[in-house]
Amino acid sequence: MTFPNINPIIFYLGPLAISWYSLSYVVGILLSWFYANKIIEKFKPQINKKTLEDFITYAVIGIIVGGRLGFVLLYNPSRYFLHPIDILKTYEGGMSFHGGALGVIIAAYLFCRKYKVNFLSLTDIIAAVVPIGLFLGRIANFINGELYGRITNASFGMIFPNSDLMPRHPSQLYEAFFEGLVLFCILAYATFKNKTLKNCGLNSGLFLTFYALFRIAIEIFREPDIQIGFILDNLTMGQILSVPMLILGSYLICQSNPK
């Protein structure tokens, strides 16, 4: 299959380039905020709309700083050690989900400590909305022709312009489907049908567990980052970083279920 050659830049505002990648973050945050408000309206959990509004700034800082530093420290430290100014070039891409997740967790902890909010009540709502951003982010990765999959002989193999011109798995679309759409549906069903917000920590546990399972599985089809390659013979950095998420998620599910 031929890669649909979509310009990563949507338009320019003077010298400022508006990219699909940047837009995915902005739209993802806005849609997540809107959806979180709907959840609060329906279930009236410990978190109210004013608290959520106050947390948005913390969340944005956590996503951007955590995501960028996670990528810098985990995936390409040598480049940024030699060229530290490049750390600020977020418009070039290079964000780590695991780093962004940790950034949001730290931001949530600091916010809850300052405003005396229950930490897991907040993360349960965050967990329900994060797949929206994941879906849009992976679509943006696909448009950029980055984070593509391994070489395949399958008929749906795609030739990416920034690769070696061999047909590869469109793993960004796999991740958009499972980590975005499927995970969103799982958490929406749990939240609205099973009323999981009543069990503090359950939504957080479900998100961590299913995200980790999907990520570990899809990494089998995704090309390892060239600057890292495989770790321990055949594991990728994404798989290794997902293991603690799986353990913590399983623990939260067990702890949150009523006896």
From Swiss-Prot:
A 1,2-diacyl-sn-glycero-3-phospho-(1'-sn-glycerol) binds at residue 138. It holds the Pfam family LGT. One of its GO terms (biological process) is lipoprotein biosynthetic process. GO terms for molecular function: phosphatidylglycerol-prolipoprotein diacylglyceryl transferase activity. Its EC number is 2.5.1.145. The chain crosses the membrane at residues 9-29, 55-75, 92-112, 117-137, 172-192, 201-221, 228-248. Its main location: membrane. One of its GO terms (cellular component) is plasma membrane. Disulfide bonds: none annotated. It is found in: Cell inner membrane. It comes from the Bacteria. It is a multi-pass membrane protein. InterPro entries: Lgt. Keywords: Cell inner membrane, Cell membrane, Membrane, Transferase, Transmembrane, Transmembrane helix. Pathway: Protein modification; lipoprotein biosynthesis (diacylglyceryl transfer). Catalyzes the transfer of the diacylglyceryl group from phosphatidylglycerol to the sulfhydryl group of the N-terminal cysteine of a prolipoprotein, the first step in the formation of mature lipoproteins. Belongs to the Lgt family. This is Phosphatidylglycerol--prolipoprotein diacylglyceryl transferase. It comes from Rickettsia akari (strain Hartford). The gene is lgt.
